[in-house]
């Protein structure tokens, strides 16, 4: 049976390096599972694969959309599964790589169909939002779906409101609806998780952000600032710089906020992934070395068990 090897883990842990190693070893392409690397205007702030890396291995779902395009995990699931089906006609093994939690769940587990919201319910929720503010909505979401409450960006009011709409419409937690029923895939899935000691990961995050600034993140953010109201740009690395452009932050403070918010996001990723008992975890000894033989042995062993 054909396989999909999924390399996942928190931001800045070193997923791309491992994914490219595996892609070269298996002579296969890479499917990016990153909800922001999709956007062609954001190569620096999303740590998208470099031109050299893209030339080394064929990547899919990288720089394929504009920030003005609407996209979600449901669309990704449909397109990625169709692509994998086609690629498996040529490749025995395909590599997927990313850290976007909902997109990974969409790929590996599938997403239930999201129902259409009753207009009256939507009006009622929006009325509460206008009268009482986002805090009232957040309290309700925490009651109905504490899992998604701990995952979502609480400053993304649109996403918070939509999640509450789904909870009240279906009587089920939004997080459960998104990945409650596991869809059987036509291929084996082997999950490789990467993690590091917390302080080492934090140091890598800090170094990465500094390099992003050196490489032109400020200019990149300025170019997309006219589109800052799009959900694609409501993400760490850009929203903080938009505050700087608006005169609300100093540049130094914005950079520190990027580092802090990235650390927070990494903790959410780790907490989310730790719930998945199918993940085979690896902890590199230092920032440059990775025990590739152990990794390949694990993949081989899992492949045998799944056949």
UniProtKB/Swiss-Prot annotation:
Keyword Transferase set for record: yes
Organism domain of life: Bacteria
Gene3D superfamilies attached to this UniProt entry: 1.10.20.140, P-loop containing nucleotide triphosphate hydrolases
E.C. no: 2.5.1.75
Record keywords: ATP-binding, Magnesium, Nucleotide-binding, Transferase, tRNA processing
Binding positions for ATP per the UniProt entry: 9-16
Reaction(s) catalysed by this chain's protein: adenosine(37) in tRNA + dimethylallyl diphosphate = N(6)-dimethylallyladenosine(37) in tRNA + diphosphate
Gene assigned in the entry: miaA2
Top-level class of the enzyme under EC nomenclature: transferase
Stated family: Belongs to the IPP transferase family.
Quaternary state and interactors: Monomer.
Molecular function terms, GO-annotated: ATP binding; tRNA dimethylallyltransferase activity
BP GO annotations: tRNA modification
Protein name listed in UniProt: tRNA dimethylallyltransferase 2
Location of region: Interaction with substrate tRNA: 34-37
